[in-house]
């Protein structure tokens, strides 16, 4: 008496799978040991046949079906008997099926999907993600709002009508009458009166568009001219220049293979390369950018290093000088990734342009404090995750620039702790 599986795993939803039996004679299936009877002991496990007569050259198929699970992960065991053998076990496991509110990979428990534009009808919505719904859930959603004059979030009753994963979507209606930051705070109460607080999310009402409605970003950088390095996030090998002499760097250089997890190994981009080969720096789309402890990867940038930096320099990048319209707030979006030991968070904001940051008593010099905020790096490894931050207008400032840096929470005295993270697709809008 042979079976092709010793264990079977099922998702939380009602689902079926098969195993095969090869036997020399009569066989039986039970749901209790030392018995050839099916007693429906578990109630949620079903088989499409309980017995059969086999021959050594024939594989007989049995289908196992598990009902939808609405509780914790559960397990069962079924037993095969016959042909001189008893209690030949097959273990069955089914995933947890309890309804969950499921945050986005960036840690937000809800988001603002769509754009809010000044003097235009709102077409955006708040999305609250969930998984493992039965399709019978009902919630009262309450939204409180700061800013966003003219826009209203539709607090009220919401029903989930389809089983599985999805979103509760709260429409935003009205016409925004003022550019600037808008913050939404969301709570939901179920039919039993239990309340869930989803925290708050901020975005901006945007005004930066031309006469045709096309957006006018203050800044973009996608590192699309970075050709070299192993792909740390995609876990793929790559190439880098065979000649790593800084003065000889050229996009026409011959290349050699490098493994995944290895950057281009040509030195710091905004330090060594910028100072040693200005023409190559322009060729890779970095003119006007400064910073420290950052490195080339294929199509994106690495911040930080594998070892502590005793000079107190965090991995960072500083944009060219920005032309920020007076009085307008901004929204920064970019992608982050991690693959090994990484800082706990990144730090962003507006600073006065300089060639790099130097730590002084645990802070970074020349930052406009009112613009500084943090983005979490508590994210899945090997995955690009979009993060965002609202940046209040910095007011009158000489040479305002955007900075993205390893956060000051990663400093230890005058040392920046070891840790690497990766940045791509930077965009700043207003």
Give a label for each model feature.
Residues 358-430:
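Terminal, low-complexity interaction segments
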Residues 62-64, 72-84, 180-191:
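A short beta-strand micro-motif common to beta-rich folds, especially ectodomain repeats
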Residues 208-276:
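Extracellular carbohydrate-recognition regions
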Residues 257-326:
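Surface-exposed, low-complexity/disordered Ser/Thr/Gly/Pro/Asn-rich loops and linkers
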Residues 134-136, 310, 325-328, 337-345, ...:
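Extended, low-complexity, turn-rich repeat/linker tracts enriched in Gly/Pro/Ser/Thr and Asp/Glu
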Residues 24-63, 136-162, 167:
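Surface-exposed binding patches on compact interaction domains or structured appendages
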Residues 314, 323-333, 397-399:
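Extended extracellular/luminal ectodomain segments enriched in beta-structured repeat modules
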Residues 2-34, 102-141, 224, 228:
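Solvent-exposed, low-complexity, repeat-rich "mucin-like" stalks and linkers
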């Amino acid at each position: 008496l042979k079976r092709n599986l010793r264990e079977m795993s099922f998702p939380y939803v009602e689902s079926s799978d098969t195993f095969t039996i090869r036997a020399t004679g009569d066989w039986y299936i039970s749901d209790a040991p030392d018995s050839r009877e099916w007693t429906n002991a578990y109630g949620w496990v079903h088989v499409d046949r309980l017995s059969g007569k086999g021959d050594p050259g024939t594989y007989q198929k049995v289908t196992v079906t598990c009902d939808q699970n609405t509780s914790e992960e559960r397990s069962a065991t079924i037993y095969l008997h016959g042909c001189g053998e008893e209690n030949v076990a097959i273990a069955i496991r089914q995933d947890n099926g309890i309804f969950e509110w499921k945050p986005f990979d960036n840690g937000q428990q809800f988001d603002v999907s769509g754009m809010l534009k000044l003097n235009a009808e709102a077409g955006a919505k708040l999305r609250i993600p969930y998984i493992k719904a039965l399709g019978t859930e009902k919630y009262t959603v309450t939204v409180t709002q700061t800013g966003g004059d003219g826009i209203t979030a539709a607090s009220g009753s919401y029903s989930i009508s389809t089983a599985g994963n999805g979103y509760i979507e709260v429409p935003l209606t009205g016409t925004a009458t003022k550019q600037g930051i808008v913050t939404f705070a969301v709570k939901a109460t179920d039919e039993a009166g239990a309340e869930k607080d989803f925290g708050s999310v901020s975005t901006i009402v945007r005004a930066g568009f031309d006469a045709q409605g096309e957006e006018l970003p203050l800044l973009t950088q996608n590192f699309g001219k970075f050709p070299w390095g192993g792909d740390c996030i995609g876990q793929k090998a790559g190439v880098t220049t065979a000649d790593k002499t800084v003065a000889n760097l050229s996009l026409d250089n011959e290349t050699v293979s490098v493994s995944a997890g290895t950057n281009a190994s040509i030195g710091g981009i905004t330090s060594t390369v910028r100072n040693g080969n200005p023409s190559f720096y322009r060729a890779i789309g970095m003119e006007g950018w400064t910073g420290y402890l950052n490195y080339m990867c294929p199509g994106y940038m690495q911040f930080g290093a594998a070892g502590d930096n005793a000079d107190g320099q965090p991995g960072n990048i500083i944009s060219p000088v920005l032309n920020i319209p007076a009085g307008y707030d901004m929204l920064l979006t970019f992608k982050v990734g991690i693959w090994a030991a990484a800082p706990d968070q990144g730090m962003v904001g507006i600073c006065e342009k300089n060639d790099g940051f130097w730590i002084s008593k645990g802070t970074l010099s020349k930052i406009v404090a009112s613009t500084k905020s943090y983005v979490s790096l508590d994210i899945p490894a090997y995955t690009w995750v979009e993060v965002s931050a609202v940046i209040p207008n910095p007011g009158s400032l000489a040479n305002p620039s955007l900075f993205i840096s390893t956060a000051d929470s990663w400093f230890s005295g005058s040392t920046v702790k070891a840790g690497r993270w990766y940045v791509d697709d930077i965009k700043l809008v207003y």
